[in-house]
């Protein structure tokens, strides 16, 4: 029986009016921000933080065109992927609440038919993929769904990443012997890691597999987008950009934990980190997210069809 696929991504503001709603949905998610406050206090506190933060974030979106492309890119990917899989593909945008009812209704119409959930995140964390799984389970507890939990170490992902990087170097006439790659993944609070979240281990294995096949290129793994208090995974991308010591002429930042470009690649990497490297006299460039690779859709289809699916209960943080 042909499955229906649920293509899940982060979601992002489609215009400036979406920013506060997006941030509120993100920050009030306990899988993301955690804490021990009662639910009603947690929601009030982080709704307030989102409201205060939104005016500071809107100008960042204005710098990248006034919106995040992640929504439209995910919708476009779903259509193309559907033809590759020869099966229906439904989209889910985790932090765009006004899209949720349509997704839930589409899934309800499937009854007992099998669904395969495909979060577009190479490396599993309870804070992102786990949150997606929890949301679907809470709203559709009887849905016959299993999940592609992660794919960061899948041979097809590794090969696609390597081809994507090498094609970028070739298109910019950058010699492999004279460049350094900073693989930038999203950060994670150490309190998650200390409780057994496998995210950093998966990132390290994925990074090692890619670096092994790029022996002539200097590579570093780092983590970006720290938010709030407490210790996060290190080294931070920003600190690496400030302190990097290499004799290579070119330094490229590769979005590693992101399959789609969005505010954290188009603004944080492009406008902040690249600027630091340029100020330090490096020839610095951002490599587009793997979504831009012409091989990505076929690679993703292969990953989906060759992965052992996981049941929801092992993916939700208790």
UniProtKB/Swiss-Prot annotation:
Which reaction(s) are listed as its catalytic activity?
A: heme b + 2 H(+) = protoporphyrin IX + Fe(2+)
Would you tell me the Gene Ontology cellular component terms?
cytoplasm
Sorted alphabetically, which SUPFAM superfamilies does this protein's record hold?
Chelatase
Q: In which pathway does it act?
A: Porphyrin-containing compound metabolism; protoheme biosynthesis; protoheme from protoporphyrin-IX: step 1/1
Provide the GO MF annotations for this entry. ferrochelatase activity; metal ion binding
The family database entries (Gene3D superfamilies) matched by this protein are listed as:
3.40.50.1400
Mainly localized where? cytoplasm
Q: Entry's InterPro entries?
A: Ferrochelatase, Ferrochelatase_AS, Ferrochelatase_C, Ferrochelatase_N
**One GO term of the biological process aspect:** heme biosynthetic process
Q: Kindly list the positions annotated as binding Fe cation.
A: 186, 264
**Cell compartment(s), UniProt:** Cytoplasm
This enzyme's EC code(s): 4.98.1.1
Q: Which CDD domains match?
A: Ferrochelatase_C (cd00419), Ferrochelatase_N (cd03411)
Listed A to Z, the keywords are:
Cytoplasm, Heme biosynthesis, Iron, Lyase, Metal-binding, Porphyrin biosynthesis
**NCBIfam families from the entry?**
hemH (TIGR00109)
Matching entries from HAMAP family are given as: Ferrochelatase
Q: Which family does it belong to?
A: Belongs to the ferrochelatase family.
User: What does this protein's UniProt record list under function?
Assistant: Catalyzes the ferrous insertion into protoporphyrin IX.
Question: What PANTHER family does UniProt report for this protein, alphabetically?
Answer: FERROCHELATASE, FERROCHELATASE, MITOCHONDRIAL
Output this protein's name: Ferrochelatase
Which classification does the entry list for the species?
A: Bacteria, Pseudomonadati, Chlamydiota, Chlamydiia, Chlamydiales
